[in-house]
């Protein structure tokens, strides 16, 4: 493939989110694994303050070092995306300094590796839609619905997908007696629109509930309280090929999710330590494996997803129960989404090629 035939991919990462650093780590892995014979990569960072800046030129800057997590630095040169002159590609132009107005880069495809608020919730997808940009992944509606645990469950139930009981709080700090009876103990208290297990608490006693609600509400004014579902946690990736066909990965079973200090599959276990391991493919019987894969695809379709998703379940004695969906799953070197497809013989580079090749205007 000649240089003229290669696609230029803008990998956008960071963002105004509690998952800023996770996004940076994901972006570094993606940049390292995009096929250089097919793609020219342009890193674009978004700082915690919301400034768009030229991204890291060395992906070593996007890796965790012990417990020190990477962030997007602001060196004063700001850029912004805009519709390209030809109406096809997306331009990133300087808006500050001596080069204000000059083109920093022109991208054929945008890969928004953004997790959490202002990136995975439909907001940046709306911006790219207004620009007419081709981008990897889900559009506005699927991103917004998938980010909100309340609406994910409502849509899933309407589609006949099993879910556990939950109560949603808007400003309240207590549950009614009926709600406590419905949920039982323990419960998990979560920001309704958050990810990477940030702001989540496991509550074993009702006296600890107000503090857990306060913690979750510090991340999102809408709080969801979910009953504990008994059974192993499994994850399943969904990948949309360029021709529109959907592929469900071999599921992964997580082990040791209750071994850490948090008592559940929390942020540290996901990104900073080795208390949790995964078995891929999950040690499930053939019927349960097929059911997990079927429900993953059904959830993907119910939310109107495009490109990719990771769908998480608990496997109970009665069958799989939906936990949540991630419309832009982690792409760190240890993230489950690429690992599940790798176990099926799809390399990280081939996975990224499929995603970029299938990028579309929504």
From Swiss-Prot:
Keyword Coiled coil among UniProt keywords: no
Residues the entry annotates as binding Mg(2+) 2: 324, 326
Annotated ranges, domain ATP-grasp: 153-357
Residues given in the record as ATP binding sites: 180-235
SUPFAM superfamilies to which the protein is assigned, alphabetical: Glutathione synthetase ATP-binding domain-like, PreATP-grasp domain
Keyword Metal-binding among UniProt keywords: yes
Enzyme class per UniProt: ligase
Protein name: D-alanine--D-alanine ligase
Organism per entry: Corynebacterium urealyticum (strain ATCC 43042 / DSM 7109)
Protein encoded by which gene: ddl
């Amino acid at each position: 493939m000649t240089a003229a035939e290669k696609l230029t991919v803008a990998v956008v990462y960071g963002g105004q989110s509690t998952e800023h650093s996770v996004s940076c780590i994901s972006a570094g892995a993606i940049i390292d694994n995009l096929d250089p014979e097919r793609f020219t990569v342009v890193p674009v960072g978004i700082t915690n303050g919301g400034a768009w800046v030229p991204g890291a030129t060395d992906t070593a800057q996007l890796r965790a070092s012990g417990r020190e997590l990477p962030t997007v630095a602001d060196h004063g040169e700001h850029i912004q995306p805009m519709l390209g002159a030809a109406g096809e590609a997306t331009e990133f132009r300087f808006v500050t300094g001596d080069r204000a107005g000059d083109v920093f880069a022109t991208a054929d495809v945008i890969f928004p590796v953004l997790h959490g608020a202002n990136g995975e919730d439909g907001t940046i997808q709306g911006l790219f839609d207004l620009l007419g940009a081709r981008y990897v992944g889900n559009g506005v509606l699927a991103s917004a619905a998938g980010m909100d645990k309340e609406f994910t469950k409502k849509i899933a139930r309407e589609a006949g997908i099993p879910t556990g009981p939950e109560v949603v709080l808007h400003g309240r700090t207590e549950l009614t007696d009926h709600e406590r009876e419905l949920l039982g103990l323990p419960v998990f208290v979560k920001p309704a629109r958050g990810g990477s297990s940030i702001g989540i608490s496991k509550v074993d006693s009702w006296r600890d509930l107000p503090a857990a609600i306060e913690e979750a509400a510090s991340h999102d004014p809408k709080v969801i309280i979910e009953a504990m579902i008994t059974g192993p946690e499994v994850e399943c990736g969904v990948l949309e090929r360029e021709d529109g066909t959907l592929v469900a990965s071999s599921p992964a079973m997580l082990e040791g999710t209750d071994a850490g200090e948090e008592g559940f599959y929390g942020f540290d276990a996901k990104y900073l330590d080795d208390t949790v391991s995964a078995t891929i493919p999950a040690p499930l019987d053939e019927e349960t494996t097929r059911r997990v894969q079927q429900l993953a695809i059904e959830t993907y379709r119910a939310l109107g997803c495009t490109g990719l998703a990771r769908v998480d379940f608990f496997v109970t004695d009665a069958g799989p129960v939906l936990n949540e969906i991630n419309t832009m799953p982690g792409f760190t070197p240890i993230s489950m989404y690429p690992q599940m497809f790798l176990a099926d013989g799809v390399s990280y580079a081939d996975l990224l090629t499929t995603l970029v090749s299938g990028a579309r205007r929504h």
